[in-house]
Amino acid sequence: LKITLSDCYFSFFLSDNFFENCIMDNMEIPFDIEERLAELFGPEEMALESNRLSSFVSWPYTSEDPCNKENLAKAGFFSDPTASSGNCVKCFFCLKALQDWDRDDNPWDEHLRLTVRKGKSCPFMELGKVEEDLTVGEFFELTKKRLNIVFAKLEEEMQEKLNK
């Protein structure tokens, strides 16, 4: 069974109810897609570097360390602590999470290493620019690519649930 969300992509933006215009052969959906989509897409405010920076309330490393909160925010990360790791971060653009940082880690290098290891590129890393250097067109292109990543992640999760 193969489900694609491409037919649903634009109806999401044209309708208050994501599923009114999205037909999936009358199948029962194994989880709340709208709720999961909101989780994957948000928090929207983390698109801005200043908001990502403010998410690092109790980051353990100082501004003298390569792995400081300023460098993490510039590299697209925001703080997303888990129960097992207080220094877990997530890239707002590609949704990849990293944890167990050392003070000498370079956020840009680690982000690149993660994307190469996972085999899926991060549009923000590919562009290689910090927020202040982005043009409006580049920002909108990143936003479009981010939406594609969110929908691909949702599709992947649906396939996993349906194949169980």
Residue ranges and their predicted role:
Residues L5-K164:
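Intrinsically disordered, low-complexity linker/tail regions enriched in polar/charged residues
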